[in-house]
């Protein structure tokens, strides 16, 4: 054995080493959700009758069920009190076992003290966890790995079973609501909900629906015709409005005029109609139009006598609506101006209760009260669309006896202001300067001492004469300029 020679060590092989990985994919068979449905037997239904567009089945239809969504109760529950009292024998047994219970309580207290001392000596455990008991769930027991289970686990929501329009009633039924049952604890009563119907387009809150429906019957009434003619009229009578259709206006300023529809505005329920008389395009509400046949349109627009008499009057009425309205407005404005001139204070030196002689009536008024630096009130409602009506201003310059230039408190200058557009202004407080504008003391400046509103009189102390005079409100005006000594 010792003499046997050991074989020489083999030289390391230089062959390359390679590693390979293979992956085998196993096709897993997923559970087919439709297997259970396929296995269920299919119920065949047979057709019994066909009524119009409805198919009547052999099997009776299922009665609709009231959907109820139950209300989830609150998790904070209390233990109900026991209704059955304990018998007397049990009470005696409890009294006898009080000593045993007290001894057990003492032992528990001693054990808790020992465990507390051990924890204080050992320190705080960083991995200590206290499980949280969820609301409405039962706590888990020691040694069990299961999670706390809720006492009332909600079912999986089936959204297809409850339509959107029935969701609200289903919720109310789950809360205890029933149809016809009053709501409330003290004064329970059934309150019917108010359902607002959508108004037709083009009819606002002030419009009457019945009037809009009656417009169709306002048109021209034809004498009764035979049944054959009536049927022909119904067949030839167009229905609805469209571009190029002949119509007649039933109400409004263009009532009785014929035309053709040029365009429709469905948002505002209005139509653009080209009138046959005048060839004008007007905008009319669709409720005021009635479609007519082409024959009726030609018969009312091609007769020269008819056009010359009725249509011309209608055209004049339609075209003259704006002018008549303007004339009426001007007439009303003139009446208002006349009433305003009667109501405002008239600046006349002497007033007589008796009749005025004709010579005095015919005599022109040559006394004017305009003066510089007077504080006046603008009373014309028509000037600049009433922008300066009842505005206080100061006379800057007098261009003529009855024309002046005024300046407002904001600095705006009004030129060519007539005397009848202004009214004298009386200061409210005593001690303000006023100017006498009418009478023998016209042009003099004084101080206002007192006022008598009932008699429209005021006591004015004239500076130069140093006397107190009683004047009417129409004869004085608030003065904003220098004293009367500087005016001479």
UniProtKB/Swiss-Prot annotation:
PANTHER family listed in its UniProt record: G PATCH AND KOW-CONTAINING (PTHR15818), G-PATCH DOMAIN AND KOW MOTIFS-CONTAINING PROTEIN (PTHR15818:SF2)
Membrane spanning residue stretches: none
Assembly notes: Component of the minor spliceosome, which splices U12-type introns. Interacts with PRKX, PRKACB and DHX16.
SS bonds (residue pairs): none
Sequence ranges of Pro residues compositional bias: 1-11
Region (Disordered): 1-20, 72-97, 216-241, 295-367
Modifications made to the protein after synthesis: Phosphorylation regulates its ability to bind RNA.
GO MF annotation list: RNA binding
Subcellular location: Nucleus
Record bears the keyword Hydrolase: no
UniProt source species: Mus musculus
Domain G-patch: 164-210
Modified residues (Phosphoserine): 25, 115, 485
GO annotation terms (biological process): mRNA splicing, via spliceosome
Keyword entries, A-Z: Acetylation, mRNA processing, mRNA splicing, Nucleus, Phosphoprotein, Repeat, RNA-binding
Listed name of the protein: G-patch domain and KOW motifs-containing protein
Pfam assignment, any one: G-patch_2
Protein purpose: RNA-binding protein involved in pre-mRNA splicing. As a component of the minor spliceosome, involved in the splicing of U12-type introns in pre-mRNAs.
Keyword RNA-binding appears in the UniProt entry: yes
Domain KOW: 231-258, 401-428
N-acetylalanine modifications at: 2
Stretches with biased composition (Basic and acidic residues): 224-236, 332-341, 349-363
GO CC annotations, alphabetized: nucleoplasm; nucleus; spliceosomal complex
Compositionally biased spans, kind Polar residues: 73-95, 307-331
Family affiliation: Belongs to the MOS2 family.
């Amino acid at each position: 054995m010792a003499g046997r020679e050991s074989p020489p060590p083999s030289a390391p092989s230089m062959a390359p080493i390679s590693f390979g990985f293979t992956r085998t994919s196993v096709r897993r068979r997923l559970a087919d959700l439709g297997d259970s449905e396929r296995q269920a037997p299919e119920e065949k239904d047979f057709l019994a009758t066909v009524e119009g567009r409805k198919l009547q089945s052999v099997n009776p239809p299922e009665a609709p069920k009231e959907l109820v969504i139950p209300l989830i109760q609150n998790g904070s529950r209390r233990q109900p009190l026991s209704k059955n009292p304990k018998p007397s024998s049990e009470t005696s047994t409890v009294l006898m076992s009080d000593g045993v219970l007290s001894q057990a309580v003492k032992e528990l207290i001693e054990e808790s003290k020992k465990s507390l001392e051990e924890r204080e000596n050992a320190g705080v455990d960083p991995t200590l966890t206290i499980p949280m008991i969820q609301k409405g769930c039962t706590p888990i027991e020691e040694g069990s790995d299961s999670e706390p289970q809720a006492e009332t686990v909600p079912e999986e929501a089936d959204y297809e079973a409850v339509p959107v329009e029935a969701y609200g009633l289903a919720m109310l039924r789950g809360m205890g609501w029933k149809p016809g049952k009053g709501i409330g604890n003290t004064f329970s009563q059934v309150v019917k909900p108010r359902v607002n119907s959508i108004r037709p387009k083009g009819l606002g809150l002030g419009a009457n629906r019945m009037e809009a429906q009656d417009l169709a019957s306002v048109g021209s009434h034809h004498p009764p015709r035979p049944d054959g003619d009536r049927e022909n009229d119904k067949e030839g009578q167009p229905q609805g409005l469209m571009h190029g259709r002949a119509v007649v206006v039933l109400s409004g300023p263009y009532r009785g005029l014929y035309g053709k529809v040029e365009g429709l505005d469905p948002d505002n329920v209005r139509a653009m109609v080209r009138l046959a008389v005048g060839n004008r395009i007007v905008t009319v509400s669709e409720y005021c139009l009635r479609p007519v046949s082409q024959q009726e349109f030609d018969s009312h627009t091609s007769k020269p006598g008819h056009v010359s008499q009725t249509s011309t009057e209608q055209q004049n009425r339609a075209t003259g609506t704006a002018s008549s309205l303007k004339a009426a407005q001007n007439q009303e404005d003139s009446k208002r101006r006349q009433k305003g001139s009667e109501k405002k204070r008239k600046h006349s030196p002497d007033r007589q209760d008796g009749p005025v002689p004709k010579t005095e009536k015919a005599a022109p008024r040559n006394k004017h009260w305009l003066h510089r630096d007077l504080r006046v009130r603008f009373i014309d409602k028509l000037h600049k669309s009433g922008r300066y009506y009842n505005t206080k201003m100061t006379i800057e310059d007098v261009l003529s006896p009855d024309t002046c230039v005024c300046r407002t408190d904001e600095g705006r200058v009004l030129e060519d202001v007539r005397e009848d557009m202004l009214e004298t202004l009386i200061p409210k407080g005593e001690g303000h300067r006023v100017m006498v504008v009418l009478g023998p003391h016209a042009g003099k400046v004084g101080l206002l001492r007192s006022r008598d509103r009932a008699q429209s009189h005021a006591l004015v102390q004239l500076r130069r004469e140093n006397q107190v005079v009683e004047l009417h409100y129409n004869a004085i005006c608030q003065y904003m300029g220098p004293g009367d000594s500087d005016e001479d």
